[in-house]
From Swiss-Prot:
GO terms for biological process: anaerobic respiration. PROSITE patterns: MOLYBDOPTERIN_PROK_2 (PS00490), MOLYBDOPTERIN_PROK_3 (PS00932), TAT (PS51318). Homodimer. Belongs to the prokaryotic molybdopterin-containing oxidoreductase family. This is Dimethyl sulfoxide/trimethylamine N-oxide reductase. Mo-bis(molybdopterin guanine dinucleotide) binds at residues 156-160, 189, 232-233, 262-263, 283-285, 364-365, 368, 476, 480, 500-501, 523, 553, 685-686, 691-693, 779, 796-797. It comes from Rhodobacter capsulatus (Rhodopseudomonas capsulata). GO terms for molecular function: electron transfer activity; molybdenum ion binding; molybdopterin cofactor binding; trimethylamine-N-oxide reductase (cytochrome c) activity. Its main location: periplasm.
């Protein structure tokens, strides 16, 4: 390969790209199958069966004449999900990105292109060489012109399982070699909790192993699912789920354990258990917990010994609770006025919890709202007052609803994976001169709107960098980020937006350069089974050959790195199977040291799976060692204790996050002060997809209402607006407007509508501010503000709106097919 340096390389890459564009219309022969061969590593079977896995579980694929025809759940899966039908359909969906595409305006004018027309579908098909040259040239241009602060590599999303084809890590690996980038901190799922919990209990907590389900079945007398719906959300996993939560849930049911669900919506978990159902107004959880805590103090019921021996700062919280500091005692009656839950119910629950072995299992939606840090902090405070933390079946848990939390752990080794190659930046001199190298991930729009502006985050103050390029893989920010219209406008600040995906998501449609990635089922990989259990290691074998011109993310980034003169550093001389073998061999070495024998790699790959035994994981009790001896087993907090009052947070001096759990009015809430709109939207996790994944598949036909995302509405609210079941409605507020299809049901409380998050944004006119979203992306309506200066998490659950029957012209949905130019 000819060696270029500096501006010569950049100029050569641009020359190749634009030369290819000039001949592409008359050179269709360049788009032949030869391009597929570059992405192939081990051939897929033409006919037969092959085991693989996904976010939805382990399965066996049937292949006939090179086409996958069926996905059959693993025989050891205790609760297979019907979403596997959509997983199969995703391979052949009409949303597939077939070829490398470049937005015509960008291809012709580069950084001088009109950015307001992003998303209009006007793309040009290009060759892989042209596309890769253009990507490499843009990365090099931005790095050389603006430095690493000009590149946002904090690409966020659920991607796909696999330790090699971890596209977000691969992106950062390439960008590190290219010169550095701005990263994102945290996530959208637990943005507030994962920042506040280390101050309170010394760990992230939201991703920690929970007291094992068998321990709960044996010891728990009252199981409380607070804003958690594990029957629904346990279908999926960050890695490959073993669905181990379901036997635990079934054991609780068989035992006759009393189950209470606190949620504005009648959830799948309520229905499964026939549970007692408490329906608070959304965003009022902290007030209810304070009312319970006040009852425990007023009736002299709380566990004073636990508070004295295992917590710090209760004496500073108590005056607030009792109203001595603000003349407002946080009584059950006070909490009832805010939450709508009867005061006597709040008192009865407090008495029940203290009298029985109680597990408070909280979900994450309660912290995805304004002042979301307070919810889990107050939950831990309430659990501390109950005094059962560290006892079998008691205390609190923050991940019983997520990826099989509580499923007994095995003694198997950890599986390593590809790394990002090191630090994200060139060094501290850049940080001092150009702002933060890491921003809170949900503040990406603030960053684009306010380059150079200061922002607070968890005790630090930094400046937003001036980002000119964003590179996104494995995610869908044009669905998962809040306040879509504001976001679309902010995205115009970017000179270049590059996306890899296998489907035409709303994010891909808004890109300048779109590269077709393979699905997980068109490449080889390796992954853990069970986020918490570590049940085994699965060979994720290629099921079918890559469709159209799709290539794996690894091959794409390796090719970009090669064009930047960093190919050897990126690949380290390994191909796909070489990396996979190295990860497995490392795990086998760990296993041998720990007394776990594993087969040689070739035998493992032939078998497809290795399983590990459960030893003592079924008896695990979270915080048991801390309870046994807090001096020998302290928490990772400054005091080593549960910090009900945090001196570190006090020193930060934030006006929106006091030093102890506090009720704080959100930006807007149902029946709250100055509420402009009458309905709260519960933007819940969907039942039939993973966030936005699988929305572009056949599964949508089973839940869409007249083609639109469903909107669950209470009969009284529907009748008051002249709305009937099945009507298409316009849901709107000051931030935007969307169409949805109504399902009238008493599963939602009056004053609340439920629209699942993850619906694909389908704007009527991308150039029109505030345009109507035709399908039903709820984040068009949600507020894009930080939870507080502490965590800066997202507030996707802080949203009020109004609903009216849609009487406008008929709309044609265009979001679930490829743009015409890309067909």
């Amino acid at each position: 390969m000819t060696k270029f340096s500096g501006n010569e390389l950049r100029a050569e890459l641009y020359r190749r790209a634009f030369l290819s564009y000039s001949v592409a219309p008359g050179a269709l022969g360049m788009f032949g199958r030869s391009l597929l061969a570059k992405g192939a590593r081990a051939e897929a079977l033409a006919n037969g069966t092959v085991m693989s896995g996904s976010h939805w579980g382990v399965f066996t694929a049937t292949v006939e004449n090179g086409r996958a025809t069926a996905f059959t759940p693993w025989e050891k899966d205790p609760h297979p999900t019907p979403m596997l039908e959509g997983v199969l359909d995703s391979i052949y969906s009409p949303t597939r990105i077939k070829y490398p595409m470049v937005r015509r305006e960008f291809l012709e004018k580069g950084v001088n292109a009109d950015r307001s027309t992003r998303g209009n579908g006007d793309f040009v098909r290009v060759s892989w060489d042209q596309a890769l040259d253009l990507v490499a040239a843009e990365v090099k241009r931005v790095e050389e012109t603006y430095g690493p602060q000009g590149v946002f590599g904090g690409s966020y999303g659920w991607k796909s399982p696999g330790r090699l084809h971890n596209c977000t890590t691969l992106l950062r690996r390439m960008l590190t070699l290219a010169g550095g980038y701005v990263n994102g901190a945290g996530d959208y799922s637990t943005g507030a909790a994962q920042v506040i919990m280390p101050h309170v209990v010394g760990t992230l907590e939201v991703y920690e192993q929970q007291t094992a389900w068998p321990v709960l079945a044996e010891n728990t007398e009252v199981m409380v699912f607070w804003a958690a719906d594990p029957i629904k959300t346990s279908q999926i996993g960050w890695v490959i789920p073993e669905h181990g939560a379901y036997p635990g849930l079934e054991a609780l049911k068989a035992k006759g354990t009393k189950v209470i669900v606190i949620d504005p919506v009648r959830t799948k978990t309520v229905e499964f258990f026939g549970a007692d159902h408490v329906t608070p107004k959304p965003q009022t959880d902290v007030a209810i917990m304070l009312g319970m805590a006040h009852t425990l103090v007023a009736e002299d019921l709380y566990d004073k010994d636990f508070i004295a021996n295992y917590t710090s700062g209760f004496d500073k919280f108590l005056p607030y609770l009792m109203g001595e500091t603000d003349s407002t005692p946080k009584t059950a009656e006070w909490a009832s006025d805010i939450s709508g839950v009867p005061a006597e119910t709040i008192k009865e629950l407090a008495r029940l919890f203290i009298s029985k072995r109680t597990m408070l299992a909280a979900g994450w939606s309660m912290q995805r709202m304004h002042h979301g840090e307070q919810a889990h902090w107050m939950l831990v405070t309430l659990a501390s007052m109950l005094g059962q933390i560290g006892l079998p079946g008691g205390g609190f848990g923050l991940s019983y609803h997520y990826s099989g939390g509580g499923t007994p752990s095995t003694s198997g080794p950890a599986l390593s994976g590809i790394t990002d190659g090191g630090a994200a930046t060139k060094g501290p001199e850049w940080l001092a001169a150009s702002g933060a190298s890491v921003i809170p991930v949900a503040r990406v729009v603030d960053m684009l709107e306010n380059p150079g502006a200061e922002f607070d985050f968890n005790g630090t103050r930094s400046k937003f960098p001036d980002v000119k390029m964003a590179y996104w893989v494995g995610g869908n920010p044009f669905v998962h980020h809040q306040d879509r219209n504001r976001m679309v406008k902010a995205w115009e600040k970017l000179e270049t937006f590059i996306v890899h995906d296998f489907q035409w998501t709303p994010t891909a449609r808004h890109a300048d350069i779109v590269l077709p990635a393979t699905t997980s089922y068109e490449r080889n990989d390796i992954e853990t089974i069970g986020d918490y259990s570590n049940t085994g290691i699965l060979a994720m074998k290629k099921i079918v050959e890559p469709l159209y011109e799709a290539r794996s993310d690894y091959d794409i980034f390796a090719a970009v790195a090669e064009r930047l003169g960093k190919g050897k550093e990126f690949t380290e001389g390994k191909d796909e199977m070489g990396w996979i073998k190295s990860f497995y061999d490392d795990a086998a070495k760990q296993g041998k040291a720990g007394g776990v024998e594993m087969p040689a790699f070739d035998a493992f790959w032939a078998e497809g799976i290795v399983e590990f035994p459960v030893t003592d994981g079924a008896d695990f009790v979270r915080y048991a060692s801390f309870r046994e001896d807090p001096l020998l087993n302290p928490l990772g907090t400054p005091t080593g204790l549960i910090e009900i009052y945090s001196k570190n947070i006090e020193k930060m001096g934030y006006d929106d996050c006091p030093a102890h759990p506090t009720w704080m009015e959100p930006l807007e809430r149902l029946d709250g002060p100055g509420a402009k709109y009458p309905l709260h939207i519960a933007a819940s996790h969907p039942f039939n997809r993973l966030h936005s994944q699988l929305n572009g598949t056949v599964l949508r036909e089973g839940y869409a209402v007249q083609g639109h995302e469903p909107c669950l509405m209470h009969p009284d609210d529907a009748a008051a607006r002249g709305i009937a079941d099945g009507d298409v409605v316009r849901v709107h507020n000051d931030r935007g407007q969307i169409l949805t299809g109504v399902k009238v049901t008493d599963a939602v409380m009056k004053g609340v509508i439920q629209i699942y998050e993850g619906g694909w944004y389908d704007p009527s006119d991308v150039t029109e501010p505030g345009t109507l979203d035709k399908y039903g992306d709820v984040n068009v309506l949600s507020a894009d503000i930080g939870t507080s200066k502490l965590a800066q998490g997202n507030c996707g659950q802080t949203v009020l709106a109004e609903v009216e029957k849609y009487t406008g012209p008929a709309v044609t949905l265009t979001g679930f097919v490829a743009p015409k130019a890309a067909e």
